[in-house]
Curated annotation (Swiss-Prot):
GO terms for biological process: L-methionine salvage from methylthioadenosine. Signal peptide: none annotated. Pathway: Amino-acid biosynthesis; L-methionine biosynthesis via salvage pathway; L-methionine from S-methyl-5-thio-alpha-D-ribose 1-phosphate: step 1/6. It holds the Pfam family IF-2B. This is Methylthioribose-1-phosphate isomerase.
Amino acid sequence: MDRVLPFRFAEEEGVFWLLDQRRLPQEEVYVPVRTAREMAQAIRDMVVRGAPAIGVSAAFGMVLAHLAGEDLEEADRRLRASRPTAVNLFHALDRMRPFWGDLAGSLLEARRIWREVEETEAAISRHGAQILWGQVLTHCNTGPLATGGYGTALGAIVEAYRLGRVRHVWVDETRPYLQGARLTAYELQKAGVPATLITDSMAGWLMARGAVDAVVVGVDRMALNGDFANKVGTYALAVLAHHHGIPFYAALPLSSVDPRLASGEGIPIEERSPEEVVAFRGVRIAPEGFPAYHPAFDVTPHRYLTGIITEKGVLYPPFAEGLRRALGLD
């Protein structure tokens, strides 16, 4: 895949450069981040997004806190509060804590987290490519822009295309932030993969017509039974795929599994500003003063999953047993 990475670290400058994903695909603009406070705001504002990419960014946020002389407890608190649903954020910050007060150790650990993301996603892509075929539908954005590596669901799709297994991709636009239209379409175009953009409401009709052979999505947080949170709209796709007898897969690094959660009932769901629903890039699309509701994620019950694609292979039901084994909890 011709990757456009969401960030880069300029160690000599003490600056973490973030690709402002709000401005894609029209502009590729990198913005400088010099403190943990700025990193937390960038994550909250979705300059960077996607669970693995948020985790890497948060880790480097703690490096920046050392460089800027910020209070480390406060920096950690701000970063944890930036996006509550993606568990990678918390895992990364937990790993950085033993290196508080140690700049060199902190930088080494942040780089290690980033390298592990790349290695893990290369494996996810290989495993996922073996089970995808024909025409695949995906939701939101799960490529390098969302991860800092090779991508999860999108990485598997691109690898499956390279192997001649997938011939075409249906891309949900993913309202209201349009990650599918702005980011997934952008990445697939760069990778040379044949794809077509659809509105979210078209998915069921495509399935009914036999135009979808499989659905694969990413994961922001998964419980031990396989219930998972992903971009809002995922649950509806899972129900539709189940109704039409279409395989439905979730692709994720095992770091996105929260071993503290027995089911999806305990996953916190971020609610974002209603303004993101009624307006986009300064253009209002609903009457002034009209109310809107904006949960950023929904939870899909594990019963709708055909399989879970991880760096250790593809897991099949019963998912609780497979996930516990993969995590080394048994």
